[in-house]
Amino acid sequence: LFLTPFNSSTLPSGSLNSMAIVNDSGQPIYGVSTYAVFHDLKLHANGLLTYFDAWDRMWYAMDSNYVIVDSFWCGNGYFADMHDIQLLPNGHALLLACDTVRGVDIRQWIGNAPQQSNVIGVVVQEIDRNKNVIFNWRSLDSGGYKVSDMIEDPYGYLEADIDEIHANSLQLDADGNIILSARHLDEVTKLDRN
């Protein structure tokens, strides 16, 4: 079982955060506590473990001895997002990032929205072994904003940023294209990598 805290903001000031691996009896196999904020500790098919470090805004990969052997970050001025990383068989990595457009008038979709809102989209990147971006897709490049669950505003976010897409995961499909899960769209989107 791979464990990382999800919401460290509820911890008292000065608290340590942890990530751990425990066996099916609950006995710790690996653990570390630090002031850093960790997310999404997981094992990949190539045997590497990855986790997201929220302070560094990047992913780290560890070998079977829990030694950091690589790190992954987004290019083109974006910061990696904590929601997912996929390590591909060719040594490349798929990463998510957020992309904000400020000062957008979204009142045609949400009548009571502020005249100037910030719309948060998602960026999907594939980086090669040398950390070069070889694929870059922006949800906000579609030319218009999609109707999403955020438009219903169930949480009263109209005074804050509008998180149009909120991507949670990505995966390669059998055709080699990217499958993106978008929570606020209630959809799974297939992205052509060609």
Regions flagged by a language model, labelled:
Residues 1-194:
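Histidine-/acidic-rich catalytic cores in large beta-rich domains
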